[in-house]
Design a protein with these regions (language model features):
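A short, structured surface patch at a secondary-structure boundary
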Residues: 30-90, 187-190, 200-204
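Positively charged n-region of N-terminal signal peptides that target proteins for export
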Residues: 1-6
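Structured C-terminal subdomain patch of bacterial secreted/periplasmic proteins
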Residues: 30, 93, 113-129, 219-272
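Boundary at the C-terminal end of the N-terminal hydrophobic targeting segment
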Residues: 22-26
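Glycine/small-residue-rich loop that forms an oxyanion/phosphate-binding "nest" at active or ligand-binding sites
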Residues: 91-108, 113
């Protein structure tokens, strides 16, 4: 057997091995636990739903329940033998350390402060899982929301962004994703408290009417499917237009925001 023939066999073996490894990286995925429905939605958008082996108690998927972001179920997580656990940065490092198997990797996503974090989260997951075939989807989402947000034309109308009229509502302020989104859409969000302001008895602002009187917005955006009776009880000193939009399209950091932007574009005549 000639040296040239043996050398050719070695090259063939190395090449085939490399191709097999590359194929595994592109078509196989690790065992993933999703600790929030919005993370599950992101994985589904990236074509990775079949990689999920466990989900939080709030998820719709029929899979083993692994607790929540703040209180993960360490025992169940351990039995599922995950390669990767994806959670939110709301989960403390101490909690993560106590509930993560030694063989698993944890990804703590930042999702609630800026719109750009949504696409950064997708890129982070792709890098950690080698799921490179989903890269075009990240690009598509990035281009879509940036294009749509420019079509809303908020005309610098002063607005307040409220989670609801009922229960314990909160207002979105600087360093929150919705503040960032509506600012990029051309509105002037007038809330000044960072992240969110809880409106309830005993707080600085105890009811919605007081919030409106303080900031005197042109528009009040309520993220509920329909206006509740509590909304009709708002009686500010200066009249304000109240607009209601489906919270499912805005409140969670996922790709549903594209549908939300479409609705804003369809309604832009209301704030000309």
């Amino acid at each position: 057997m000639s040296f040239r023939y043996i050398f050719s066999l070695i090259l063939l073996y190395i090449s085939s091995t490399f191709i097999s490894i590359s194929h595994a990286n592109s078509s196989e995925c690790p065992r993933i636990i999703s600790q929030s429905p919005y993370i599950t939605e992101m994985l589904t958008y990236l074509g990775m739903q079949h990689c999920i082996v466990g989900v939080s108690r709030y998820d719709k998927l029929d899979l083993p329940r692994t607790g929540g972001i703040l209180d993960p179920d360490a025992e169940t997580i351990d039995t599922l033998m995950p390669d990767i656990i994806i959670t939110s940065d709301w989960a403390t490092k101490e909690t993560v350390k106590l509930t993560t198997p030694k063989t698993a990797k944890v990804i703590r996503l930042k999702s609630f402060y800026k719109m750009i974090q949504l696409e950064e989260n997708m890129a982070t997951v792709i890098k950690a899982t080698h799921w490179v075939q989903a890269t075009p989807r990240v690009t598509a989402f990035k281009q879509a929301w940036r294009k749509k947000v420019k079509q809303v034309h908020g005309n610098q109308k002063k607005v307040l962004l409220l989670s609801s009229c009922s229960g314990t509502p909160y207002s979105f302020g600087p360093d929150s994703r919705l503040y960032d989104l509506f600012t990029q859409a051309g509105f002037k969000v007038v809330e000044t408290k960072e992240k969110i302001r809880h409106i309830r008895p005993g707080n600085e602002i105890e009811h919605i009417t007081a919030l409106i009187d303080l900031y005197q917005p042109d528009l009040l955006f309520i993220f509920e499917q329909r206006l509740r009776k509590q909304c009709q009880m708002i009686t500010p000193k200066v009249p304000v237009s109240i607009l209601s939009f489906d919270g499912k399209l805005f409140l969670q950091p996922n790709t549903e925001i594209l549908k939300g932007l479409d609705i804003l574009i369809q309604n832009k005549e209301r704030w000309k």
